[in-house]
């Protein structure tokens, strides 16, 4: 049985003081969280130790927003798996569309990051998705399949999460129709050939659409951006009820 993963990606938001205030509001909202789901937050690196301390003994798990493929070395601005594990981080987001866009990350680099995470006991959340232009040209499936096949090469599908995030739906307020998101997630599952693969949807997820998304047969969780910054809104998302 696939256990859904509800994850919030804070991106470059939240100081340590803001993270403390956030978790003070959020933790009471998940006091009765059902046991049939994982709950994860990916804060900026500076707030990881703060959240690790304040979330100890709760249902909240931690993710990094990236991870390097080397254990140490002259890699300015990067972070290693061992540095993350020291703070009880369990997941690592790799391949998000923003580093793909702004830092020209390739599928090969993303695969190196994901392999490093998995080898060192972290669960990679590998992001894939097409741009608006690629979708309008009918290239969405080809682009996503390439990202999946190259990004997941050599990985154990039972120890990773794939996040389908159509780029045109990230931070735009546009949400992919639940049925279409479900169709793409089903294709990803068939390409990987693993019925137990956890596949999230990401892209303008909010309290108003979470129940419908989680009612889809091939969507096993969500990767939430802006809506995860509001503790009450993210609490509602965490406590979804399938529609």
UniProtKB/Swiss-Prot annotation:
Residues the record marks as active site: 96, 165
Pfam families assigned to the protein according to its UniProt record, in alphabetical order: TIM
E.C. number(s) listed in UniProt: 5.3.1.1
Compartments, record wording: Cytoplasm
Protein's pathway: Carbohydrate biosynthesis; gluconeogenesis; Carbohydrate degradation; glycolysis; D-glyceraldehyde 3-phosphate from glycerone phosphate: step 1/1
Keyword Cytoplasm part of the UniProt annotation: yes
Domain of life per record: Bacteria
Function per UniProt: Involved in the gluconeogenesis. Catalyzes stereospecifically the conversion of dihydroxyacetone phosphate (DHAP) to D-glyceraldehyde-3-phosphate (G3P).
Protein name: Triosephosphate isomerase
Native source organism of the sequence: Synechococcus sp. (strain CC9311)
Lineage: Bacteria, Bacillati, Cyanobacteriota, Cyanophyceae, Synechococcales
The encoding gene: tpiA
């Amino acid at each position: 049985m696939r256990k859904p993963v509800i994850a919030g990606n804070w991106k470059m938001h939240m100081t340590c003081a803001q993270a403390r205030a956030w978790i003070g509001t959020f933790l009471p909202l998940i006091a009765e969280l059902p046991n049939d789901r994982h709950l994860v937050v990916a804060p900026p690196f500076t707030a990881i130790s703060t959240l690790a301390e304040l979330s100890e003994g709760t249902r909240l798990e931690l993710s990094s927003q990236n991870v390097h493929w080397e254990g140490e070395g002259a890699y300015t601005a990067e972070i290693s798996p061992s540095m993350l594990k020291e703070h009880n981080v369990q997941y690592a987001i790799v391949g998000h569309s923003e580093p793909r866009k702004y830092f020209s990350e390739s599928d090969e680099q993303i695969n190196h990051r994901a392999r490093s995470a998995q080898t060192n006991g972290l669960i990679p959340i590998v992001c894939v998705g097409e741009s608006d232009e690629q979708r309008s040209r009918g290239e969405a499936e080809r682009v996503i399949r390439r990202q999946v096949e190259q990004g997941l090469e050599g990985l154990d599908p039972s120890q990773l999460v794939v996040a389908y995030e159509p780029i045109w739906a990230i931070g735009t307020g546009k949400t992919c129709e639940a049925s279409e998101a479900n169709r793409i997630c089903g294709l990803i599952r068939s390409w990987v050939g693993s019925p137990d693969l956890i596949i999230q949807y990401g892209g303008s997820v909010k309290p108003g659409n979470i129940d419908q998304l989680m009612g889809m047969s091939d969507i096993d969780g969500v990767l939430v951006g802006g809506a995860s910054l509001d503790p009450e809104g993210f609490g509602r998302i965490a406590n979804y009820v399938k529609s």
